[in-house]
A protein has these predicted regions:
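A glycine-rich, hydrophobic/aromatic-adjacent loop/helix-cap motif
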Residues: 1-168
Length: 168
């Protein structure tokens, strides 16, 4: 688990405190779609290229336990993905990003990346969290039957893994 200092350092490496936040977008493809937690002034349907959405991160916290790990979605290399682009409110963007960093980066299972969000309103530059294949939480491809069993049976403090599937 990352410390507050590590999280802040990581966020500042991607988005320094003095960043102009007037056109700052975040790409949501999993729980951010239905529970964005960040104050935003606009949301648009967006497609990214070069990554696809996949259950590829083990969780022993939110949607699983040490005894029965669950799986959560991440972006993995290849393909494309439709999700939601959130334009952050400029006056609160840095504080909102710190909150988002605590939620998404605490286990260091993701890498933060700038991606092109293709929307009906043009191309936006957006921040996305993609799977870090070097972390132990990364789940390489598995038989479909095993994936279904995991999602159907795992439960964590945020509820059953299958609820996460249906919510996203």
């Amino acid at each position: 688990i990352a410390s507050e200092d590590q999280l802040l350092e990581s966020r500042r490496a991607m988005i320094p405190d003095d960043t102009d936040c007037r056109d700052l977008w975040v790409f949501g493809y999993g729980s951010l779609i239905y529970n964005p937690i960040i104050a935003h002034e606009q949301r648009l349907i967006a497609r990214i290229h070069g990554y696809h959405r996949r259950f590829c991160l083990w969780t022993q916290i939110g949607r699983g336990s040490p005894e029965c790990p669950g799986l959560v979605l991440s972006l993995d290399r290849g393909g494309s993905c439709v999700g939601v682009g959130f334009k952050l409110q400029p006056d609160t963007a840095i504080a909102e990003l710190d909150l988002l960093w605590r939620r998404e980066m605490m286990t260091l299972a993701y890498n933060a990346r700038w991606l092109r969000l293709h929307t009906d309103d043009g191309i936006k530059r957006g921040l996305a969290f993609v799977a870090n294949p070097r972390r132990p939480a990364y789940a390489p491809s598995m038989p479909f039957k095993d994936l279904v069993t995991t999602v159907a049976t795992a439960i964590g403090f945020n509820g059953p893994c299958h609820d996460y599937l249906f919510d996203t």
